[in-house]
Amino acid sequence: MIHSTWNTPADFWKDRRVCVTGGAGFLGSFVLAALQQRGAAHVFVPKIEDYDLVNPQDIQRMYHDARPDVVIHLAALAGGIGANRARPADFFYINLMMGVQLMHEAWKRGVEKFVAIGTVCAYPKFTPIPFREEELWNGYPEETNAPYGLAKKMLL
């Protein structure tokens, strides 16, 4: 549904400042292209070299620099089964703290919209296929991806 003050969906994005964490990643490249196609003219992509999104001071500085109306949070510590097994605490802590602190700072600053992206790794180990959203909370994720999956699930 288009809000009564918008003539087209592009009107929504035209004057909004958008911050896309993880915008330099695989999914981020598609999100940036979609935003451009929809008329978003003010898009800020924080670079990992400039902002540690687990550090509260860096998060505050990022929000100060970007001044976003909308945040699309795609950034993550991601890896395969081996990486999750080798560093489970890092996968859980970094992904959870990054998301929670970004979300909390957005709330404190009155950001209009915050979008946190989930993952199929958040679904229970024995979820029927095709996956349905109603199944998300019906069990524990598959153990090899649980640290990442649980952290992302907690942001939904």
What are these regions (language model features)?
Residues 91-99, 103, 115, 151-152:
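Short alpha-helix in the Rossmann-fold core of NAD(P)-dependent oxidoreductases
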Residues 1-18, 64:
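Non-catalytic terminal and boundary segments that flank Rossmann-like NAD(P)-dependent oxidoreductase
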Residues 57-96, 105-108, 125:
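NAD(P)H-binding glycine-rich loop region in Rossmannoid oxidoreductase-like domains
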Residues 143-156:
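Active-site Tyr-X1-5-Lys
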Residues 41-61:
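Adenosine-cofactor binding site in Rossmann-like domains, unifying the SAM/SAH pocket
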Residues 100-145:
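Conserved Rossmann-fold NAD(P)-dependent oxidoreductase catalytic core, especially the SDR/UDP-sugar
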Residues 21, 46, 71-77, 114-120:
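SDR active-site strand-loop-helix element
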Residues 10, 17-36:
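N-terminal Rossmann NAD(P)H-binding glycine-rich loop of SDR-like oxidoreductase domains
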